[in-house]
């Protein structure tokens, strides 16, 4: 990856590999810094296990331009990818982290709980819950207490429910989720 640069870390790594199977690797320790996309991310703590193509455990980033704490299980290598995790994002500044060229001097915070399956947005089955979403920029400030998105499939029809303090919506039928914003 051209965007990946120097990495400084102190990790305990224990692994095993059996022929014709994905390796099992336990990781615990600190990535002091990693250069990615012309930015040096600092203080990344890992405590988890890479198994069968997925990661189960905790990842924490404590960077001057935001903190992220993830705890749970993500497996994108299984036949049907699975996501079951919690995340806390605090004062993240995506422009300063070189994640986007847009939104200078903007930061956001939120708590997220996700439990869903699917390899794309159109295959999603499950639930995402966002709490305490806070967005701050020089021009705007926004706060939302809670938003819940639930996607299911019944009788070969998609069902999507969105619930928040300012909107409750439900869509059912034969559609693809990615086409909804343009509708």
Give the role of each language-model region.
Residues 1-113, 117-183:
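Interface amphipathic segments
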């Amino acid at each position: 990856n051209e965007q990946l640069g120097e990495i400084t870390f102190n990790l305990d790594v224990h692994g095993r590999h059996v022929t014709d199977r994905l390796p099992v690797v336990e990781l615990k320790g600190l990535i002091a810094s990693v250069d990615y996309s012309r930015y040096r991310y600092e203080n990344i703590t890992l405590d988890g296990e890479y198994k069968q193509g997925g990661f189960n455990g905790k990842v924490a980033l404590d960077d001057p331009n935001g903190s992220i704490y993830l705890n749970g299980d993500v497996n994108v290598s299984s036949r049907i990818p699975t996501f079951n995790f919690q995340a806390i994002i605090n004062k993240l500044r995506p422009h300063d982290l070189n994640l986007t060229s847009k939104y200078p001097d903007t930061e956001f915070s939120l708590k997220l709980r996700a439990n869903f399956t699917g390899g794309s947005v159109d295959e999603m089955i499950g639930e995402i819950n966002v709490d305490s979403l806070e967005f701050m920029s020089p021009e705007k400030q926004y706060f939302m207490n809670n938003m819940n998105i639930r996607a299911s499939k019944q009788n070969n029809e998609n069902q999507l429910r969105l619930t928040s303090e300012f909107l409750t919506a439900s869509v059912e039928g034969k559609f693809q989720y990615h086409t909804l914003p343009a509708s």
